[in-house]
């Protein structure tokens, strides 16, 4: 057992930083001493009750740190390795075998819902009582994480783990969605709806492909300014402008060939679909409550429009995360412009700032 501290989500939604104990890693697992963890909107979904994760429980799924212990049958990872943590998968189903682990047949229980390891056991306790963990195969809002081997990506020993922590989910999702799914080219008009961490990452990713237009849509002026700084060619302020009319004006009536809705809001998805060009595609991610529906005008999509969903950017973390690390090292992925750091004991302030829109990507330092 390893003693540590963690931010525990209670049944009433409060977050209580508590002393906890971590079991030794089992087969296919490693114990990571965390340096930092990014706060993601999926975490907020749990706190709001929209994602049914058991309580008391530990969430957090953008961990970064160094390996302390290695379980049986783990290959290629050793104590002392610097690592970034992402989502987990089974590695054996058809989706995993075809290098689409975000669509693993057991993705939901392994990452979101059960709070238990794949074998049904726990691993974290507080005052002798079990605490749910294994969120995205890690549960990283604490000093340590028991992480699945398949969620672990090794990085250079001198990597700045605090800066790189958000690569495991938010940035991965933005880049993966843009590069793996939408794949913009020089004749495309791209619109990104929502200028949070996922959306701004998508703006950076799209800008590297140099589409003819790259438009960011949001309600927060400071985020729109940041989108322009990161490569957007135009912005739309949804708090004061008619988004559909403004997009029609910006595109000369052509419409948006590639839209990416990062908000998880059905009204935004409908706006994006209405604004899409003939044979345009709208990609949707986000974590709305189960049962959330999008209203679609069937006549409006008969021009070949496509509405498509995506999870985790359809990315394999062990492939994309090293590319993102290299982009950051080359100065082409300015993560520092998105981040603000908070101590573990100040995690509720980080949550409040993210809700308010004053911080794009809070990073919790362990």
Task: Please describe what each predicted stretch is.
Residues 1-2, 270-274, 278, 314, ...:
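C-terminal hydrophobic helical "lid"/dimerization subdomain
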Residues 87-150:
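Cysteine-cluster motifs in flexible loop/terminal segments that predominantly coordinate metals
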Residues 143-144, 150-152, 156-241, 245, ...:
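Mid-domain Rossmann-like dinucleotide-binding core that forms the NAD(H)/NADP(H) cofactor-binding site
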Residues 23-37, 47-97, 102, 154-158:
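Glycine-rich beta-strand-centered segment in the early N-terminal region that forms part
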Residues 31, 64, 83-84, 178, ...:
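Hydrophobic beta-strand signal
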Residues 182-186, 208, 221, 225-306:
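Glycine-rich cofactor phosphate-binding loops and adjacent beta1-alpha1 units
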Residues 21-22, 54-60, 133-137, 143-144, ...:
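Short Gly/Pro-enriched turn/cap motifs at secondary-structure boundaries
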